[in-house]
């Protein structure tokens, strides 16, 4: 209904001005709404900081007493409330950006509308001008008519009458022209005014709809936050109820108890006889009382020692004193180890110290790596760490309590280690302090998540060209954390894993059976047919927001370890899991001698951001049939995030670390996301299909990293699988390698031809396919085999394997053929399998952006490989 077209007319024609000023108030309302949302975001941020401060206050509660475990309940609840309000702050800031963006667009729209309604402004001005002239013309006409009538009554001359009639006719004509001009201006004004009114109403309708949508987003964000807050309070109430009084008393008794054995009764006779015997022993061992050091004529204990040990009688001077032998003349004898403490005049004599360092006993010349590593650990364990920044270290005295000099200790060294520097010092330093953070993705186990107990399928990737990126500086902390023992910083030799090599397996039906994904702590976001559902008894947001402390409540606050030790295949497909694992050869490193402090530890606030790295790993499953260009394809992938080892201490210290949040872009092709419910949260209310925001549960992240650090304290980085995803790829252009196969099975001759071609459109960035292998199974005895080009034969698995060079866009096609004579009748066609890997791109095109501050992205790795890649005739 056109409200503006019906209610803004009137005699004075002020309707257009009212409508125009109403439209101009739109940007003002948008600006005021932005100010309101900004102020609400500031309030939520302040409240979040206050809750974080309250959580810190709860964490500093006294660990003594039976009430101590309940402080952990308060801390967890406060952390969750702070996280809820912080998430609302983030949503409000995003909404504020939308409001400001709309305000800019609104200004452009109003500027364009102002140019379009200029005609209406002219029509209003024209009608106003004509309306002002019309009364004047009417007054003039009335005046002329009255003059003519007055002359007629006065019987004026005809000449005067003619003049008056002429003037009256001219006034009538002028009035008629004014009326016609007014009617014309009015008609033009009515048309333009109606058009402008409709235009203004449409603008206001769009403005109000957009503003209502913004208000709906605001209300939805606040409502979601209040629902989460209600869940946190409900969980707090449940946790308090679960921690019973008996549980608190039992926990205090078990942790602070002094023992279960009660003191027994005493027998007076036995107790008194034992005391009497002890007193007699003390009396027999006592010496006569005397004041030492009053006379220099008392012989020294050291002289008595020399007399008893030396076969030469001591030299005596004229007064009867024994002369101390010169140390320089008695090199053959062992220096005295005792001195007299009975004299008060010891400090007046010059005292000489004789230090004799005995060489280490001769050992075998050969020094094994195990002995060298054990020796290095013993040496490093006796070292004292340098003081931290702003700290001081007291220098200990070289004398013991008796005043004698201590003999310096030296670590035993073998002959070969002491003769020359070892050439293996560089591998040792790498094993002690680890490679840079970015080298975490050069190993085959980067897709695993050892902290959560997830085991992924073997990765077919190998590290051929490690990137030269900056060192994170967090790989080798030189200061021990306040919690662990000093052994946590003692370097230990590691045994890094080697990159695997692709080895194909015979794709027999038994080897192509899919592996069902194991249940794990993952929350699906898709259909039940594609992703394994999570445990229905799993606790949601309430059960994962916790931080490990020295005191924990033995109640449902902590999750059972059973969920954390389950394995999950990287391919959640029910029938398309990669079942051709590569070999994993072992790798060992000879350890040498040497030690280095490594880079200085990073303290939160000493750098702009903490480094993290991510990796996208995808597996493509495809099935081709004969020479048909169509295929069935599905891609599964996972996102892995890597943290340097030193960041564990930063996360465990104070102040608490900022929340790590990130955004996945180009998510429209992905059908299902399966996030790790124990580590990350997502906003289900996001409407943009191209992006998806996630943020990490910092308490659970810290616990997972600490668990990995306990399991592997020498690791320089830790990997965590954050989420998995899958999507379908229809059409032949959706896979990187198009394949076709043709079998000709005769009674005396079998011919097989395989064709392949590279598809550059499967990925956004064309990357070569490496480690390409084509596997042709032959499950029968054959003779007269001819292969073009040459292939290798695996007797155990009964298959031919073509190892092809890298397949890229230039010349990325080829033809393979094989023929043989079957010995047991016509051959049975079997599927031909392919294997390959690719670095530098993904099939999904997903990308990751960090949100907020406190972290920086050190490296983003992208790679994909084959899962089940088959072609049948």
UniProtKB/Swiss-Prot annotation:
Q: In which tissues is it expressed?
A: Mainly detected in brain and spleen.
What's the name of the protein?
Answer: F-BAR domain only protein 1
The gene coding this protein: Fcho1
Pfam families the UniProt entry points to: GMIP-like_FCH, muHD
Q: Where is this region: Mediates membrane-binding?
A: 1-275
Q: Where in the cell is it found?
A: Membrane, Clathrin-coated pit
Q: Which residue windows does the record flag with biased composition (Polar residues)?
A: 816-827
Q: Where does the record place a coiled coil?
A: 155-178
A GO molecular-function descriptor? AP-2 adaptor complex binding
- Single Gene Ontology BP annotation: T cell receptor signaling pathway
Task: List each copy of the MHD domain by range.
Answer: 609-872
Cellular component (GO) terms are: clathrin-coated pit; cytosol; nucleoplasm; plasma membrane; postsynaptic endocytic zone
**Region of interest (Mediates interaction with the adaptor protein complex AP-2), residue spans:** 267-439
The family note in this entry says: Belongs to the FCHO family.
Q: Which organism is it from?
A: Mus musculus (Mouse)
Residue positions where Phosphoserine is found in the record: 295, 343, 368, 518, 600
């Amino acid at each position: 209904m056109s409200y503006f077209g019906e209610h803004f007319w009137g005699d004075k024609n002020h309707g257009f001005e009212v409508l125009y000023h109403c439209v101009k108030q739109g940007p003002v309302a948008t600006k005021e709404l932005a100010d309101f949302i900004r102020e609400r975001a500031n309030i939520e941020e302040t409240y979040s900081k206050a809750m974080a401060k309250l959580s810190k206050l709860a964490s500093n509660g006294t660990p003594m007493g039976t009430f101590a475990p309940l402080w952990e309940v308060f801390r967890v609840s406060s952390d969750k409330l702070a996280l809820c309000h912080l998430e609302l702050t983030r949503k409000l800031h995003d909404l504020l950006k939308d409001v400001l963006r709309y305000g800019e667009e609104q200004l452009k729209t109003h500027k364009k509308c102002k140019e379009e309604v200029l005609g209406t402004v002219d029509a209003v001005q024209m009608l106003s001008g004509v309306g002002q002239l019309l009364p004047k013309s009417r007054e003039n006409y009335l005046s002329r008519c009255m003059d003519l009538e007055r002359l007629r009554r006065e019987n004026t001359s005809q000449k005067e009458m003619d003049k008056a009639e002429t003037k009256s006719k001219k006034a009538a004509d002028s009035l008629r022209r004014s009326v016609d001009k007014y009617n014309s201006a009015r008609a033009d004004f009515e048309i333009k005014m109606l058009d402008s009114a409709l235009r203004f109403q449409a603008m206001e309708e769009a403005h109000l709809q957009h503003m209502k949508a913004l208000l709906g987003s605001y209300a939805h964000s606040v409502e979601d936050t209040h629902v989460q807050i209600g869940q946190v309070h409900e969980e707090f109430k449940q946790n308090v109820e679960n921690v019973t009084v008996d549980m608190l008393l039992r926990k205090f008794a078990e942790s602070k108890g002094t023992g279960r054995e009660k003191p027994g009764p005493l027998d007076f006779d036995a107790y008194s006889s034992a005391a009497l015997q002890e007193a007699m022993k003390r009396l027999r061992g006592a010496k006569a009382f005397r004041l030492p050091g009053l006379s220099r004529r008392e012989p020294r204990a050291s002289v008595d020692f020399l007399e008893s040990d030396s076969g030469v009688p001591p030299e005596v001077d004229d007064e009867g004193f024994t002369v101390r032998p010169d140390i320089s003349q008695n090199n053959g004898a062992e220096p005295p180890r005792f001195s007299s403490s009975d004299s008060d005049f010891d400090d007046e004599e010059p005292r000489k110290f004789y230090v004799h360092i005995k060489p280490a006993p001769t050992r075998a010349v050969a020094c094994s790596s195990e002995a060298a590593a054990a020796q290095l650990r013993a040496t490093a364990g006796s070292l004292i760490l340098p003081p931290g920044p702003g700290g001081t270290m007291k220098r200990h005295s070289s004398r013991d309590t008796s005043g004698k000099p201590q003999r310096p200790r030296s670590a035993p060294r073998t002959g070969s280690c002491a003769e020359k520097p070892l050439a293996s010092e560089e591998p040792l330093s790498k094993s002690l302090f680890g490679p840079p953070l970015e080298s975490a993705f050069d190993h085959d186990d980067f897709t695993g998540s050892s902290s959560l107990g997830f085991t992924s399928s073997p990765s077919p990737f190998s590290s051929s060209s490690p990137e030269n990126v900056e060192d994170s500086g967090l790989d080798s902390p030189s200061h021990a954390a306040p919690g662990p023992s000093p052994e946590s910083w003692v370097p230990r030799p590691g045994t890094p894993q080697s990159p695997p090599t692709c080895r194909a397996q015979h794709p027999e039906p038994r080897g192509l059976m899919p592996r069902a994904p194991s249940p794990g702590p993952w929350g699906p976001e898709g259909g039940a047919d594609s992703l394994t559902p999570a445990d229905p008894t799993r606790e949601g947001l309430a059960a994962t927001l916790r931080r490990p402390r020295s005191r924990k409540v033995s109640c449902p606050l902590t999750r059972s370890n059973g969920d954390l030790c389950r394995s999950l295949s990287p391919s959640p497909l029910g029938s398309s899991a990669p079942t051709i694992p590569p070999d994993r050869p072992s790798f060992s490193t000879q350890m040498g001698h040497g030690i280095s402090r490594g880079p200085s530890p990073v303290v939160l606030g000493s750098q702009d951001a903490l480094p993290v790295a991510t990796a996208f790993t995808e597996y493509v499953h495809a099935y081709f049939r004969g020479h048909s260009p169509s295929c069935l394809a599905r891609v599964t992938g996972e996102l892995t995030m890597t943290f340097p080892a030193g960041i564990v201490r930063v996360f465990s210290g104070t102040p608490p670390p900022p929340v790590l949040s990130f955004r996945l872009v180009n998510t429209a092709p992905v059908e299902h996301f399966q996030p790790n419910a124990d580590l990350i949260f997502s906003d289900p209310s996001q409407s943009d299909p191209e992006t998806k925001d996630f943020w990490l549960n910092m308490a659970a992240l810290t616990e997972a990293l600490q668990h990995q650090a306990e399991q592997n304290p020498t690791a320089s980085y830790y990997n965590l699988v954050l989420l998995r995803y899958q999507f379908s790829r229809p059409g032949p252009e959706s896979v990187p390698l198009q394949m076709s196969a043709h079998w000709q099975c005769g009674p005396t001759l079998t011919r097989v031809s395989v064709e392949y071609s590279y598809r550059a459109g499967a990925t956004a960035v064309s990357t070569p396919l490496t480690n390409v292998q084509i596997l042709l199974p032959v499950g029968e005895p054959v003779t007269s085999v001819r292969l073009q080009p040459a292939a290798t034969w695996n007797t155990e698995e009964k298959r031919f394997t073509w190892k092809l060079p890298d397949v890229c866009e230039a010349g990325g096609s080829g033809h393979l053929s094989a023929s043989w004579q079957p010995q047991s009748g016509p051959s049975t066609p079997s599927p031909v399998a392919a294997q390959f890997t690719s670095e530098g791109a993904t099939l999904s095109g997903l990308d990751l952006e960090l949100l907020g501050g406190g972290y920086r992205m050190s490296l983003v790795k992208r790679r994909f490989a084959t899962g089940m890649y088959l072609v049948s005739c």
